[in-house]
Amino acid sequence: EELRALAEVEEELNERWPETKIEPSLERIEMLMDLLGHPERSFDVIHIAGTNGKSSTARMVDSLLRAFHRRVGLVTSPHLQRVTERIGIDGQPIHPRDYVRIWHEIKPFVEMVDAQSDVPMSKFEVLVGLSYAAFADAPVDVAVVEVGLGGRWDATNVVNADVSVITPVGLDHTDYLGDTLAEIAGEKAGIIKPREDADDPLTPNENIVVIAEQDPEAMRVILQQAVDVEAGVARSGSEFAALESRIAVGGQQVNIQGLGGLYEDIFLPLHGEHQAKNAAVALAAVEAFFGASAGHPLDVATVRNGFAQAISPGRLERVRTSPTTFIDAAHNPHGAKALGAALDRDFDFARLIGVLSIFADKDATGI
């Protein structure tokens, strides 16, 4: 009964603009948030943009925050099997019953926005609204929010984040975001904003942006945005770094230089050196969120526990043995290169067969 109701809601939402069709405006989602009483202001936010590594980084941040006994909401996209995967609460997908209930609660307000807009709300905009309403309903302490596409005009960007994260920027979605790394980085950096309550003596006077390793062209644009809005900056390779990654059964052992100090012998149940780098970014984001600084690290045992529980479905995920079978969501050359390097480093297959399915708008030759 619950799954049938979920399917009916999904069918209803599929009649809206598809997620790949975006308009450079936050007007509709802002109107919905206003009508709902601003649920997006009821929790702290770590906001994550970038081309590759967003979902894995978001899931690691989520796992770390829960290890520190925070109630966490998680927004990721797209889903692999069921739409409820996109909205996580306390480490679990939202229950279909709650998904359907909250949709029916916000539906009249969505229809009010539709009536006042030139075009109706897109499916993605509605899902973002549903996510933020679900987090306020739960309620959660902090939301880890993965950008859907770009950053500046992404519907998730109605939040004012405590910590913004930019994972590696590469060429993807060039028809929407621009043809150069600088243009794409400019769109991603749109999530870096000045702190709304900077004059409040009880809050930090700046937001923090955590930046993964970047091509110099992209890094210049991201840093300029941080300077323009007076955000604090933590860069991979400067303020923090993945120092060492050793192959281990079921994943890898990682040493990370964090913002607060050295975190050694961390077991990460994910494969590939790129995931060690994602882990360093995730840890820096959580350190920034809690205010860790040089000489004042987070509790190492809790950090180890958080990373040990991390999962990232569809990212070099082993789904069977005999024969060993992995699935991976790489869909651009940068992601495919990381996948190839991980297979080469972490495994020793005598024979490897790749089965690829690539959308027409992707760089199939590069992949």
Task: Please describe what each predicted stretch is.
Residues V142-V147, D154-V165, V169-H173, E183, ...:
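Nucleotide phosphate-binding/pyrophosphate-handling subdomain across enzymes
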Residues D118-S122, V209-A212, F326-I327, I353-V355:
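Short catalytic-loop micro-motif centered on adjacent basic/acidic residues
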Residues V113-A115, P139-E146, A161-D265, A279, ...:
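Acidic, Mg2+-coordinating active-site environments of NTP-dependent enzymes
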Residues V61, S131, I222:
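Aromatic/hydrophobic pocket-lining residues that form π-stacking "cages" and hydrophobic walls in ligand
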Residues L35, L64-F68, A134, A285-A292, ...:
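Active-site catalytic microenvironments for nucleophilic, acid-base chemistry
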Residues E1-N52, S56-R71, L80-Q81, P139, ...:
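N-terminal leader/targeting and accessory segments in enzymes
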Residues S77, Q214, L356-A360:
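Cofactor-binding loop segments of dinucleotide-utilizing enzymes, especially the Rossmann-like FAD-
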Residues T20-I22, L26, E30-R41, A67-V159, ...:
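ATP-dependent carboxylate-amine ligase catalytic core
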